[in-house]
């Protein structure tokens, strides 16, 4: 983190020597205390040499937090992080334990000949002020108001206190104050809050007001910063001249600094033991009452080393509490400008003293717990809430009063929760204004038209939110949540091009006056658990007075949550408007989709039929998931994606992979026999890799199948060979399984016997084995994706015969062959877990397949290189497989698992180039292609040892 000490142009000597800490006037001196650590009693406070006449009582360690209700901000996780506070004071000790790592820069503006610039803060006042604003907890001390804020120090106060000119107000000056460079440096570090716990200066010549205001204007007006000034410690009825700068008069009765009020706060002090009482030393708010509030003036803070604790008093120590609070509000609402931060702190202050804004306490006592919940008063005209689209959780929960109105701008959402009674109008220019959990507005609401009405409007969300006034809708009114009764206690006008956005199952908009409608309706999903039935009615508007006009555009649906499976038409009478809902046939909507999607549509249609006849089931998790499915958007493609996810085709493809793996083992043994026929010396123990590309052991399915087979050859007469083999294959299906994940493990044993007659041969095989299967799938139900899983297994047996003739020799051969095979697979029942009942279940299944085979194997060797190729045609002899039926787990809705039935005929082709490198290294490059059924291909380059 950057830390700098910079020497800036020194303030005018006479001016610098006149500045005093503690906001001017009398103020306390640091008094050391011990932390409250029972059972050791704290020592008594040693009296100063010359005790002041009205010294306050020593405060508790957490008085500055307790009296200001700062614990609420801590509970909300607010620390002021991301906000920088400028401490214009006697300097800030950069290595102070409470501030360590967060003092970004130390600027010096005092005379090095008269002051010790080798120490960041000789007086210690600025460090104490910074600790109260932004210090982290140290030992028994609980920390300052905004312990995550960063500090920039501007040292303008000399090491020795000045002498008063006899006026009791400090020292007078005329002309510019000389702080313009201070402000520019703070701006360069993006300081948003400038704390001024100093005073001791005043002026009497009227032109000076404009000159001083000009020095503050860049920080307040151009930069958008907030100035916090201590009122002073003279016990007067008015704050110091500088503190009340926006109210100071200029030439000819003008107020040349009045524009600074938008970014200016004055801090007076109360007794922490009697927060309704002005501290005896504190200047009252006086003419600054409109931008003044109070905070405790007595506070405990740690020394720079963190080993000792001190307490002091003065408006100097009230000001940093307000500065820290400003940092918390800015963190909570980063889109606020300086004026709205100021208004929020003032408008949420606790009223003390005379009712309302008074000349003693201004707006009252700082209440951080309320301030972090947004504005409390609109006393300064209309409030513009420019909530950007990136802002989240922007909730104003105070009951807002005052004469101003609200203007909603920016693409983000602003939520009002309170019972608001501000008198001005409400204007929604952009973005969404949401009345949540019974929030109330007592004003007319105007919603401006936008090219994209979905992004702008008034939302009723939860409970009984109300607008007590008329609503003119040029974009959208939103009713999209359950348990919400949105009410307009006045008239409702929906203009052409505007819309009422509603969720099916939501309550209608209630209008106590008259409703005049145009525009249209936009359906935004469904209230959770609601499944529309044929002929259902969705109420839109109920007007207690009368309803006139009609919607001029057909009802539409929103993007990813638009309805694909429900159609609607409008209905009206003299007081009501509604939608007539008709359930769209899922099977009809899916008529142009894939076979697997159509099978899923049949299953979904059956489930909807069960739901329509069982109101109790509609309120279940299955009913809620069915409602989500009806939210499916994205047009035909969105519907296709959802149905495909529900089809369960991964089960069918995994079953097909089992058959292909059995065929892969058959071809591996046939290839082994072919090699032994060419070179009888190879007879004996052998091992072969399964799943290698281009080598005849390609499964030909959409899964990645790998495995091994090992066997032992035995002689059978003079021309015969028999053997036994064992093997294992593992298949993994990913994206080719429709986005699902499948894992099969298959173990088998094979018995084979073959005979040769010259170059001709005959080979018979018998095998059996078992498999285990794990499938994990994703279901698309509306806008959500939900996982389901199943674990099951099965058994298989197979038999095959093959005859062929080998042409060529050991290094070059070509073998055509004919054959037949028969395979039976018995699969256990399965039941998927998850998916709110939209997972699948299936009974045990048995499939027997027989096929004729015609193929060709070839091989050519050149030194260490070998080229191999194969081609095989497979022709089914039996009819199609019996349908493997599956139903949803939640209801009985059966339909076939599409993609299960094998093609009548298909072909496998492959070629591989292989070379041995050294004694144990092998390089292979291969490609396989299946044609017919689920076309698949595989290419691979591998090096193995």
List each model region and its residues:
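Subtilisin-like serine protease catalytic core
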Residues: 37, 58, 71-107, 112-174, ...
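Extracellular beta-strand/loop-rich repeat segments of large surface/secreted proteins
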Residues: 457-539, 545
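Extracellular S/T/G-rich loop segment that most often corresponds to the catalytic His/Ser-adjacent loop
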Residues: 89, 97, 247-327, 331, ...
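Outer-membrane translocation/initiation segment of Type V secreted surface proteins
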Residues: 32-33, 335, 347-397, 401-403, ...
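Extracellular repeat-rich scaffold modules on cell surfaces
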Residues: 305-308, 315-316, 320-331, 379-450, ...
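Outer membrane beta-barrel translocator domains of Type V secretion systems
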Residues: 617-814, 822, 924-945
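Outer membrane beta-barrel transmembrane domains
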Residues: 750, 829, 840-945
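Substrate-binding/access-modulating region of protease and related hydrolase catalytic domains
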Residues: 23-35, 79-80, 136, 156-259, ...
């Amino acid at each position: 983190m950057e830390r700098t000490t910079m020497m800036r142009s020194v303030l005018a000597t006479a001016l610098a020597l006149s500045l005093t800490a503690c906001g001017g006037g009398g103020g306390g001196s640091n008094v050391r205390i011990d932390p409250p650590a029972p059972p050791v009693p704290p020592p008594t406070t040693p009296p100063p040499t010359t005790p002041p006449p009205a010294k306050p009582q020593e405060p508790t360690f957490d008085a500055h937090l307790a009296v200001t209700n700062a614990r609420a901000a801590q509970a909300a996780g607010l620390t002021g992080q991301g906000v920088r506070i400028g401490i214009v004071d006697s300097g800030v000790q950069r290595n102070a334990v409470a501030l360590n790592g967060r003092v970004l820069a130390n600027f010096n503006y005092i005379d090095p000949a008269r002051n010790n610039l080798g120490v960041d803060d000789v007086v210690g006042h600025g460090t104490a002020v910074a600790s109260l604003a932004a210090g982290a907890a140290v030992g028994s001390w609980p920390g300052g108001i905004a312990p995550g804020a960063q500090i920039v120090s501007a040292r303008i106060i000399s090491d020795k206190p000045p002498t008063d000119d006899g006026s009791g107000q400090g020292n007078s000056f005329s002309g510019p104050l000389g702080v313009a460079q201070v402000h520019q440096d703070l701006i360069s570090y993006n300081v948003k809050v400038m704390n001024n716990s100093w005073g001791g200066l005043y002026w009497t010549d009227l032109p000076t007001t404009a000159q001083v205001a000009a020095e503050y204007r860049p920080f307040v007006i151009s930069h958008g910063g907030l100035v916090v000034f201590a009122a002073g410690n003279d016990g007067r009825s008015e704050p110091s001249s500088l503190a009340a700068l926006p109210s100071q008069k200029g030439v000819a009765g003008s107020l040349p600094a009045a524009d600074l009020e938008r970014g200016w706060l004055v801090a007076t002090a109360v007794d922490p033991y009697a927060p309704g009482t002005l501290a005896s030393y504190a200047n009252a708010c006086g003419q600054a009452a409109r931008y003044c509030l109070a905070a405790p003036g007595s506070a405990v803070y740690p020394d720079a080393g963190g080993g000792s604790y001190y307490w002091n008093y003065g408006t100097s120590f009230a000001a940093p509490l307000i500065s820290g609070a400003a940092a918390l509000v800015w963190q909570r609402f980063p889109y606020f400008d300086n004026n709205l931060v100021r208004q929020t702190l003032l408008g949420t202050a606790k009223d003390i003293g005379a009712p309302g804004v008074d000349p003693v306490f201004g707006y009252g006592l700082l209440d951080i717990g309320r301030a972090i919940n947004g504005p409390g008063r609109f006393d300064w005209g209309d409030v513009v809430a420019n909530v950007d689209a990136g802002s989240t959780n922007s909730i104003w929960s105070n009951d807002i009063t005052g004469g101003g109105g609200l203007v909603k701008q920016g693409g983000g959402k602003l939520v009002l929760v309170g019972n608001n009674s501000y008198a001005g109008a409400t204007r929604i220019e952009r973005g969404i204004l949401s009345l949540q959990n019974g929030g109330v507005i007592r004003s007319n609401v105007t919603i401006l038209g936008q090219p994209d009405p979905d992004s702008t409007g008034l939302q009723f969300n939860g409970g009984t939110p109300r607008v007590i006034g008329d609503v003119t809708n040029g974009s959208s009114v939103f009713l999209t949540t359950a348990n919400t009764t949105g009410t307009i206690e006045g008239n409702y006008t929906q203009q052409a091009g505007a819309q009422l956005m509603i969720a099916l199952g939501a309550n209608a908009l209630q209008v106590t006056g008259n409703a005049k409608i145009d525009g249209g309706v936009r359906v935004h999903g469904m209230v959770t658990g609601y499944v529309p039935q044929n002929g259902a009615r969705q109420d839109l508007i109920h007007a207690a007075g009368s309803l006139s006009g009609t919607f001029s555009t057909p009802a539409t649906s929103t993007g990813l949550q638009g309805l694909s499976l429900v159609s609607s038409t409008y209905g009206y009478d003299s007081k009501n408007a509604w939608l007539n809902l008709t359930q769209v046939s899922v099977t009809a909507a899916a008529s142009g989709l894939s076979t697997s999607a159509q099978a899923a549509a049949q299953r979904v249609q059956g489930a909807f039929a069960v739901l329509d006849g069982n109101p109790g089931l509609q309120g279940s998790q299955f009913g809620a998931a069915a409602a989500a499915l009806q939210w499916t958007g994205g047009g035909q493609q969105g519907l296709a994606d959802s149905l495909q996810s529900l089809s369960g085709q991964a089960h069918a493809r995994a079953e097909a992979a089992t058959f292909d793996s059995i065929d892969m083992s058959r071809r591996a043994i046939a290839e082994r026999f072919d090699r032994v026929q060419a070179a009888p010396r190879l007879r004996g123990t052998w091992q072969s890799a399964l799943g290698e590309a281009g080598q005849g052991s390609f499964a030909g399915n959409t899964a990645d199948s790998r495995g091994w087979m090992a066997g032992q050859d035995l002689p059978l007469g003079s021309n015969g060979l028999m053997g036994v083999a064992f093997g294992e294959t593992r298949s993994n299906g990913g994206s080719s399984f429709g986005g699902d994940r499948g894992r099969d493990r298959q173990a088998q044993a094979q018995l084979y016997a073959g005979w040769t007659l010259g170059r001709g041969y005959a080979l018979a095989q018998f095998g059996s084995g078992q498999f285990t299967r794990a499938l994990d799938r994703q279901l698309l139900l509306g806008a959500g994706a939900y996982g389901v899983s199943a674990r099951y297994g099965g058994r298989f047996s197979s038999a095959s015969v093959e005859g062929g003739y080998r042409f060529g020799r050991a290094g070059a051969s070509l073998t055509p062959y004919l054959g037949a095979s028969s395979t039976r697979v018995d699969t256990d029942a399965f039941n998927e877990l998850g998916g709110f009942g939209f997972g699948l279940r299936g009974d045990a299944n048995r499939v027997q397949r027989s096929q004729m085979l015609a193929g060709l194997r070839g091989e050519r060797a050149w030194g260490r290189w070998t080229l191999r190729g194969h081609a095989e045609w497979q022709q089914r002899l039996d009819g199609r497989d019996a349908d493997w039926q599956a139903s949803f787990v939640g209801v009985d809705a059966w339909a076939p698992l599409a993609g299960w039935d094998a093609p009548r005929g298909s072909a496998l082709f492959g070629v591989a180039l292989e070379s041995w490198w050294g004694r144990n290294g092998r390089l292979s490059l291969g490609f396989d292609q299946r044609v017919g059924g689920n076309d698949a291909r595989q290419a691979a380059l591998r090096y193995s040892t």
